[in-house]
């Protein structure tokens, strides 16, 4: 959330607050200054529009609150991006996704602004821990030419950062195989064993200052 202050000699000072910017988004603020012969400050609380009428791209933004409470599995960051409209996993265990029918090798994966897409397969090389993610943007269609060399989607992931106070958390995620449904009957198994999926994952995060107001750290395991 940002604020903008405009001031000029002979005019009233005007401040607009509550301007919220999502990852990859832009906001426009029209500030009008009136003539003034005395000191005066006008504060206007405003928010950027939910629908951006200046672009045709199909974008989905997930903030930290959504990432923390999303009703999805939390074993890889693909569990988050696959929740975006038009995006689906190529397989149940793959490190690649499809967007509106595009091929899996036509996407781009960005982590804190760095391209970590495998050049040959189009997969994501590192898998960011879901609890270390601050914000996610999925450009399903109409990604701007800034990215280039792609016909699919852009998955932009921003990780959490340290602050002036120490904070941390630890989590354990578990899905028992008894929670996985069986799609066949015993007569349809052809005497082959039926293996259900079972997942276990533990995470630990810690962040804080090395030097307050200057240098911070954040780690996730």
Which role does the model predict for each range below?
Residues 16, 66, 120-123, 188-192:
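Extracellular loop and loop/strand-boundary signature of outer-membrane beta-barrel proteins
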Residues 180-187:
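Outer-membrane beta-barrel translocator domains and adjoining extracellular loop/strand segments
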Residues 68-118, 150-160:
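Extracytoplasmic beta-strand/coil segments of soluble accessory domains associated
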Residues 46, 170-176, 219-221:
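Transmembrane beta-barrel strands of outer-membrane/channel proteins
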Residues 31, 83-86, 116, 130-175, ...:
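A beta-strand signature from Gram-negative outer-membrane beta-barrel systems
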Residues 72, 147-149, 194-199:
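Short sequence motifs at beta-strands and strand-loop junctions characteristic
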Residues 1-63, 129:
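Periplasm-facing N-terminal accessory domains of Gram-negative outer-membrane beta-barrel systems
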Residues 43-70, 104-107, 114-116, 187:
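N-terminal periplasmic "start-of-domain" segments of outer-membrane beta-barrel proteins
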């Amino acid at each position: 959330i940002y604020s903008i202050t405009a001031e000029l000699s002979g005019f009233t000072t005007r401040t607009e607050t509550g301007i919220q910017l999502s990852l990859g988004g832009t906001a426009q603020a029209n500030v009008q200054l009136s003539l003034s012969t005395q000191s005066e400050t006008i504060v206007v609380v405003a928010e950027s529009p939910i629908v951006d009428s200046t672009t045709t791209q199909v974008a989905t933004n997930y903030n930290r609150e959504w990432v923390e409470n999303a009703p999805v599995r939390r074993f890889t960051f693909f569990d988050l991006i696959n929740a975006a409209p038009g995006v689906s996993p190529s397989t149940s265990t793959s490190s690649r996704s499809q967007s509106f029918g595009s091929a899996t090798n036509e996407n781009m994966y960005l982590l804190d602004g760095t391209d970590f897409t495998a050049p040959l397969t189009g997969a994501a090389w590192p898998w960011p821990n879901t609890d270390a993610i601050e914000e996610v943007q999925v450009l399903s269609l109409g990604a701007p030419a800034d990215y280039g060399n792609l016909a699919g989607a852009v998955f932009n992931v921003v990780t959490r950062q340290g602050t002036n106070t120490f904070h941390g958390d630890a989590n354990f995620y578990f899905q028992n195989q008894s929670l996985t449904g069986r799609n066949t009957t015993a007569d349809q198994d052809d005497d082959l064993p039926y293996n259900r999926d079972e997942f276990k994952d533990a995470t630990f995060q810690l962040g804080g200052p090395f030097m307050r107001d200057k240098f911070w750290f954040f780690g996730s395991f």
